[in-house]
Amino acid sequence: MTSNELKEIMRKQGRADALDLAARAPQMDGTAIIAEEEKIPAWSENAVYTSKQVGYPVQDNGQVYTIQMPHTPAHNPGSRPADLRAIYSLLHTTDPAKAKPWMPSYGTSGLYKLNEVCTYPNAQGVEHVWRNLWNDNEFPPLTLNVESRWEDLGEAAAYGL
Protein backbone atom coordinates (compact mmCIF):
# COMPACT_ATOMS: atom_id res chain seq x y z
CA MET A 1 0.00 0.00 0.00
CA THR A 2 1.36 3.41 -0.94
CA SER A 3 1.43 6.39 1.40
CA ASN A 4 -1.21 8.09 -0.78
CA GLU A 5 -3.51 5.08 -0.48
CA LEU A 6 -3.01 5.04 3.28
CA LYS A 7 -3.77 8.77 3.49
CA GLU A 8 -6.97 8.25 1.50
CA ILE A 9 -8.08 5.46 3.84
CA MET A 10 -7.37 7.66 6.86
CA ARG A 11 -9.21 10.62 5.31
CA LYS A 12 -12.28 8.45 4.64
CA GLN A 13 -12.22 7.09 8.19
CA GLY A 14 -11.90 10.59 9.62
CA ARG A 15 -14.88 11.74 7.55
CA ALA A 16 -16.93 8.72 8.63
CA ASP A 17 -16.06 9.36 12.29
CA ALA A 18 -16.99 13.05 11.99
CA LEU A 19 -20.33 12.25 10.32
CA ASP A 20 -21.12 9.59 12.94
CA LEU A 21 -20.47 12.05 15.77
CA ALA A 22 -22.43 14.79 13.98
CA ALA A 23 -25.46 12.50 13.71
CA ARG A 24 -25.34 11.74 17.45
CA ALA A 25 -24.37 15.24 18.65
CA PRO A 26 -27.89 16.75 18.94
CA GLN A 27 -28.68 14.20 21.68
CA MET A 28 -25.33 14.65 23.48
CA ASP A 29 -24.13 17.14 26.07
CA GLY A 30 -20.87 19.07 25.90
CA THR A 31 -18.98 16.51 28.00
CA ALA A 32 -19.92 13.64 25.66
CA ILE A 33 -19.11 15.65 22.52
CA ILE A 34 -15.78 16.94 23.83
CA ALA A 35 -14.85 13.37 24.87
CA GLU A 36 -14.77 12.62 21.12
CA GLU A 37 -13.00 15.86 20.23
CA GLU A 38 -10.57 14.16 17.84
CA LYS A 39 -13.56 13.46 15.55
CA ILE A 40 -14.78 17.07 15.46
CA PRO A 41 -13.94 18.91 12.24
CA ALA A 42 -12.25 22.28 12.30
CA TRP A 43 -14.48 25.26 11.59
CA SER A 44 -13.92 26.66 8.11
CA GLU A 45 -14.52 30.16 6.83
CA ASN A 46 -14.99 28.61 3.38
CA ALA A 47 -17.75 26.23 4.46
CA VAL A 48 -21.47 26.54 3.81
CA TYR A 49 -23.33 25.24 6.87
CA THR A 50 -26.81 24.14 5.80
CA SER A 51 -29.91 23.38 7.87
CA LYS A 52 -28.83 19.73 7.74
CA GLN A 53 -25.75 20.67 9.81
CA VAL A 54 -27.55 22.50 12.62
CA GLY A 55 -26.42 20.83 15.85
CA TYR A 56 -23.15 19.59 14.35
CA PRO A 57 -20.02 20.30 16.39
CA VAL A 58 -17.05 22.27 15.06
CA GLN A 59 -13.83 23.30 16.78
CA ASP A 60 -11.95 26.54 16.52
CA ASN A 61 -9.09 28.09 18.51
CA GLY A 62 -9.19 25.37 21.17
CA GLN A 63 -12.94 25.62 21.80
CA VAL A 64 -15.84 23.39 20.71
CA TYR A 65 -19.13 24.80 19.42
CA THR A 66 -22.35 23.49 17.90
CA ILE A 67 -23.87 25.14 14.84
CA GLN A 68 -27.18 26.81 15.76
CA MET A 69 -28.43 27.98 12.36
CA PRO A 70 -27.61 27.66 8.66
CA HIS A 71 -25.13 30.22 7.42
CA THR A 72 -22.10 30.92 5.26
CA PRO A 73 -19.08 32.10 7.30
CA ALA A 74 -17.63 33.95 4.29
CA HIS A 75 -20.53 36.43 4.63
CA ASN A 76 -18.90 37.58 7.90
CA PRO A 77 -15.25 37.88 6.84
CA GLY A 78 -12.77 37.88 9.69
CA SER A 79 -15.34 36.59 12.19
CA ARG A 80 -14.92 33.29 13.99
CA PRO A 81 -17.32 31.21 16.12
CA ALA A 82 -16.27 33.10 19.28
CA ASP A 83 -17.48 36.31 17.59
CA LEU A 84 -20.80 34.89 16.32
CA ARG A 85 -22.30 33.27 19.40
CA ALA A 86 -25.88 33.57 18.15
CA ILE A 87 -24.80 31.20 15.37
CA TYR A 88 -22.41 28.98 17.38
CA SER A 89 -23.14 27.70 20.87
CA LEU A 90 -20.07 27.23 23.08
CA LEU A 91 -19.78 23.82 24.77
CA HIS A 92 -18.17 22.89 28.09
CA THR A 93 -17.17 19.61 29.75
CA THR A 94 -17.15 18.16 33.26
CA ASP A 95 -13.88 16.30 32.54
CA PRO A 96 -10.91 18.22 34.03
CA ALA A 97 -8.53 16.57 31.54
CA LYS A 98 -10.53 18.12 28.67
CA ALA A 99 -11.10 21.56 30.23
CA LYS A 100 -11.04 24.52 27.85
CA PRO A 101 -10.02 28.12 28.60
CA TRP A 102 -12.79 30.17 30.24
CA MET A 103 -14.83 32.25 27.80
CA PRO A 104 -17.62 34.71 28.56
CA SER A 105 -21.16 33.63 27.86
CA TYR A 106 -23.32 35.31 25.25
CA GLY A 107 -26.95 35.18 26.33
CA THR A 108 -27.48 31.54 27.20
CA SER A 109 -24.66 30.37 24.92
CA GLY A 110 -21.70 29.39 27.02
CA LEU A 111 -23.18 29.66 30.51
CA TYR A 112 -21.37 27.21 32.78
CA LYS A 113 -23.64 24.49 34.17
CA LEU A 114 -23.10 22.77 37.50
CA ASN A 115 -19.80 20.79 37.60
CA GLU A 116 -18.54 22.02 34.22
CA VAL A 117 -14.87 22.95 34.19
CA CYS A 118 -12.58 25.51 32.60
CA THR A 119 -8.99 26.63 32.76
CA TYR A 120 -8.19 30.05 34.19
CA PRO A 121 -5.12 31.62 35.81
CA ASN A 122 -5.00 31.64 39.60
CA ALA A 123 -4.03 34.76 41.58
CA GLN A 124 -0.35 34.11 40.77
CA GLY A 125 -1.03 33.82 37.04
CA VAL A 126 -0.60 30.03 36.89
CA GLU A 127 -3.19 28.24 34.71
CA HIS A 128 -5.51 26.12 36.90
CA VAL A 129 -8.54 23.93 36.28
CA TRP A 130 -11.71 25.17 37.97
CA ARG A 131 -15.02 23.33 38.59
CA ASN A 132 -18.21 25.39 38.50
CA LEU A 133 -20.40 25.06 41.60
CA TRP A 134 -23.28 27.25 40.41
CA ASN A 135 -25.81 26.51 37.67
CA ASP A 136 -25.83 28.99 34.76
CA ASN A 137 -22.68 30.76 35.96
CA GLU A 138 -21.51 33.60 33.72
CA PHE A 139 -18.63 34.78 35.92
CA PRO A 140 -14.99 33.65 35.63
CA PRO A 141 -13.15 32.15 38.58
CA LEU A 142 -11.78 34.67 41.10
CA THR A 143 -14.43 37.30 40.28
CA LEU A 144 -14.98 39.48 43.35
CA ASN A 145 -18.02 38.42 45.42
CA VAL A 146 -18.64 35.23 43.42
CA GLU A 147 -15.45 33.28 44.24
CA SER A 148 -17.58 30.60 45.92
CA ARG A 149 -19.01 29.67 42.52
CA TRP A 150 -15.76 27.92 41.55
CA GLU A 151 -13.61 25.17 43.08
CA ASP A 152 -9.88 25.21 42.27
CA LEU A 153 -8.89 21.69 41.11
CA GLY A 154 -5.20 22.53 40.83
CA GLU A 155 -2.70 23.29 38.12
CA ALA A 156 -3.80 22.59 34.55
CA ALA A 157 -0.44 20.91 33.88
CA ALA A 158 -1.40 18.14 36.33
CA TYR A 159 -4.23 17.25 33.92
CA GLY A 160 -2.01 17.30 30.86
CA LEU A 161 -3.29 20.69 29.72
Tell where the protein language model's regions lie, with residue ranges.
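Tryptophan-rich substrate-binding surfaces of secreted polymer-degrading and adhesive proteins
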Residues: 2-161
